[in-house]
Amino acid sequence: MSQSPTNVPRSYNSVLDLKLASPTNSASGATGGWIVQKFGGTSVGKFPENIVDNIVKVYSQTNRVAVVCSARSSQTKSEGTTSRLLRSADLAENDKDYQPLLNAIEEDHVTNAERIQSEEIKQELIKDTKQEIEHVRELLHACQIIGEISPRSLDSIMAVGEKLSCLFMTALMKDHGLNAVYINLQDVIPLSYDFQKGFDDSFYQFLSQEIGKRVLQCDKEREGEEDVIPVLTGYFGVVPGGLLNGVGRGYTDLCAALAAVALQADELQIWKEVDGIFTADPRKVPNARLLDSVTPEEAAELTYYGSEVIHPFTMEQVIRAKIPIRIKNVENPTGKGTIIYPDNIGRRGEATPPHPPAAFEQLAMSSLLQRKRSATAITAKQDIVVINIHSNKKTLSHGFLAHVFTTLDKYKLVVDLISTSEVHVSMALSIQSDQESQLKHALVDLRKMGTVDVTKKMTIVSLVGKQMVNFIGIAGNMFKVLADEKINIEMISQGANEINISAVINEKDTIRALKSIHAKLLEGGSAIGDSSAVDTRLEALKLS
């Protein structure tokens, strides 16, 4: 008799949860569609057995599962494998000794292989690990001789982090009885690919198709075997100018998104070390609540202004394909998590949704009849520098602004918020410790245009909510809360899409501002007004 798998969510926060709990699904083989699960480097470093036994193994009982892994991190991203590989490359380029750092990476991964019980699988993993590290040594030696590292070489060095992580997770899954297969995507982009159009939609469509082909080819080669679990490297090949410059450190999320699109997945799952998206950072605001769902627009704003959710560009790929994204916690796999719903639940041009309305009728009432809210969440972005420039009037206003932005672009400084008049500009910039030198040089150039005042140690506090556009007085309420707390506002801004209201305040007031705004606008009496866009779509679907 078929049984529902254990350790699955009992609050049906998505159609996938319904499949997992359904008694009609066999525990011996997957009957549902694909799901793509992306695991970050810290999760792979700290909780690999939990990932295999309580997540991949459980979901693979009812669905086809594809896994994408970031490079392994034992504690923090700064001490992760990718960061250490990049530091090794920097040492080699400057003719310094990179061997100790590379030896530490090798030792860390070989030691980690001791988690594998099967001696055969363990020794194979150690052999593969040492081969990858030796490849990096050869590359770094060559780069040290010529005194420079090309973007292509840097990509190849950086790719080893994802390879080592996926080799380990594949071995661990095999050790725990799963039919996992390692798929290296390093050469998924052919050398003949024409990049004349750059990173446009056609490139990502092509890349998605190629990733899908690799997965389906793997299936075909193992036809007749128990359902294969492909483990994909988050790194997906050499691109002009380098992957870091072209995509950034979020390339693993992007790879998972493209795989989900290619496989027409039921869901893309992003597994982190938090339960989902909260109304505020629970480390700073103890009363913060877990959100059952947010819209893509809200998730994008929260990501940009301080909450690490998922990169907006990555999210765009799956939202366009009408695939839900679920944020879940590797330490609490049975938790509800947070769903990011597409704007239109139907997908691929269909008039009807991908899943029958009857399934949605069984969704948790918390998803269908969410509390009506004016704002969704409050977030903070620290390490902000405010620059005020008053023109010396030697240039016209358009020339003044052009000079300002040209200077910022020259030193690769990004503006988070800006307020302008004909002869005055106020800007809030996020400046990390490794950008201090660029900021210093930029200020020298900016002072040629007029008087420049700089204020450091500031924070951008942002109130986010798609329904705020329908409420009168939200901005006034937010600023009144700050005034009541005697918190001075340096700058204010409202996004053109009207789902984000931001204020720049002193960094020392950050926690007090978050707590007070959360208490007054996101708790209790704030639950008034129209329902969220997600509520409206799901309710309409329920009644159809």
From Swiss-Prot:
Key word Transferase present: yes
A Pfam family annotated for this UniProt entry: AA_kinase
Signal peptide segment: none
Catalytic reaction(s) noted: L-aspartate + ATP = 4-phospho-L-aspartate + ADP
Free-text disruption phenotype from the record: Sensitive to sulfometuron methyl (a compound that increases flux through the threonine biosynthetic pathway). Does not decrease survival in a mouse model of infection.
Domain ACT: 463-535
Pathway the protein takes part in: Amino-acid biosynthesis; L-methionine biosynthesis via de novo pathway; L-homoserine from L-aspartate: step 1/3; Amino-acid biosynthesis; L-threonine biosynthesis; L-threonine from L-aspartate: step 1/5
Biological role stated in the UniProt entry: Phosphorylates aspartate, the first step in the biosynthesis of amino acids that derive from aspartate (the aspartate family of amino acids), including methioinine and threonine, the latter of which is a precursor to isoleucine.
Family: Belongs to the aspartokinase family.
Name the record gives this protein: Aspartokinase
Organism placement in taxonomy: Eukaryota, Fungi, Dikarya, Ascomycota, Saccharomycotina
